[in-house]
Amino acid sequence: RMSRGLGDVYKRQTQTEKNLQAAFAGESQATNKYTYFASVAKKEGYEQIAEIFRKTSANEQYHAKMWFRELEGIGTTAENLAAAADGENFEWTDMYDEFAKTAEEEGFSELAEKFRQVGAIEKHHEERYRALLHNVETAAVFEKSEVKVWECRNCGHIVVGTKAPDVCPVCNLSLIHISEP
């Protein structure tokens, strides 16, 4: 077994790195596919089969996470936000733009339009991640320069102010459960 920390070795474009990337991609696709299959089985009245799809999906999700960790793809929240923003940027500036052009050239105009629309959504995702990253980097996640509405995600209590309370005054849960609605 290769241990965590061999990221520099993987970065040399070894076959093992390619295998890890393929394993991550395959397991990631499988977890989504089995979730979709579970919905169909449940809708058709096959609850036991739906549960097996859901259970297998959870297994595949763990496998994907395991391979992603080996690739050292999980960092701090700030690193993860930056990586997510970069990924979303690639999707809207390159990937979906190219997909739309190809679909258009091949006569799939409706699909080309969907690619463009999803590209616009990916742009919004990038902007959201970059704003969140800025908040993390400037310690502005739980404190703002202007008055905000803060909501306890547990009980729904609302607080208005520049800073989220350290503890919800209603349910006593800590700051991590309070966010802007």
Where on the chain are the PLM-derived regions?
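Inter-helical turn/loop segments and adjacent helix faces that build the functional surface
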Residues: K43-Y46, K101-L111, V136-A139
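Short domain-boundary/entry signatures in modular proteins, especially
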Residues: G73-T77
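Cys/His-clustered metal-coordination modules, chiefly Zn-binding fingers
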Residues: A120-S179
